[in-house]
Amino acid sequence: MRDAILFLALLGVIPFIFKRPVVGALAYACVGLMNPHRLTYGPAYDFPFAMVLCCVTLFSLLVSREKKKIPMSGAVLVLLTFVTWMSVTALFAQEPVIAWLEWNRVMKTMLMIVITIMTVRTVNDVKALAVVVALSLGFWGFKGGIFTVLSGGHSRVLGPGGSYISDNNTLALAMVTALPLLVFLITLAPTKWLKRTAIALALLTAIAAIGSYSRGAMLGGASMLFFLWLKSRSKVTTGIALILVAPLILFAMPEQWSGRMASIDNYQEDESAMGRINAWHFAVNVANALPQGGGFGVF
């Protein structure tokens, strides 16, 4: 049933992509971030939905009357420079077979990012993209938040298998990244009930990040919440809400969660933390020995 729904959704969205290429960019963002096919058990599980959407969107953009121009800005220039540098490092990769396989995977994503930059032109397009990204990641925030509440925080929240956010750390990063967009979603809500729904979704997403048991999520989330408070128009109201809600969530987590977070103070005794620190030292050594980089898979 889930497979049929996804295939019908794909067929249903294609005509709209030919009408407006930006619809393809939005659909790709949904599939790439939400990974709905990973919730199926049939042929849809491994079906290349993202590739199909990318090809259809690219073809639609090429045949459309819209301007085919990349709007250059500082951020876009940095992105294109980064993409170029990734290709350079792949040429000098220490593990060429692995490097080119990963390069192929990454460049497909980068191609669609460039297409998205070209097709998202208006303010409404930007808002639509923000909503799609927020809801796509918010789906896993909702699911993970409910799971954390029902399990009492005794189990880790994981992402969809075979995706960029499959393990607890990458999922936590996605949840923390989604929170500002969910806050933006609250401001866009036209009715009281939609606003309350968006607030609940943001709260569950924060709980999902906490339930991931990721120490990086705790540090990143704290920094992000401080930044949101700093940019808030009503700092007093926002500050009081954070002071009241945050401790309740943290105190509700079990002792094993508190113990893992407290291990930050004794990182020398934690294999995971020391492994990352060793990886940082290794990265510095690679950069010193190979100015052009070690390429994908060097770790």
Where are these regions (language model features)?
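Transmembrane signal-anchor hairpin modules in multi-pass inner-membrane enzymes, especially those
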Residues: 1-88, 97-101, 121-131, 186-196, ...
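Alpha-helical transmembrane segments of multi-pass inner-membrane proteins
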Residues: 8-17, 57, 80-91, 108-115, ...
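Conserved catalytic core of Hanks-type protein kinase domains
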Residues: 17, 33, 106, 119, ...
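Transmembrane helix boundary and interhelical junction motifs in multipass membrane proteins
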Residues: 23, 215, 219, 294-296
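Short aromatic-rich membrane-water interface segments that cap or initiate transmembrane helices
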Residues: 37-43, 159-171, 272-275
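Membrane-interface loop/short-helix elements at transmembrane-helix boundaries
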Residues: 156, 163, 255-299
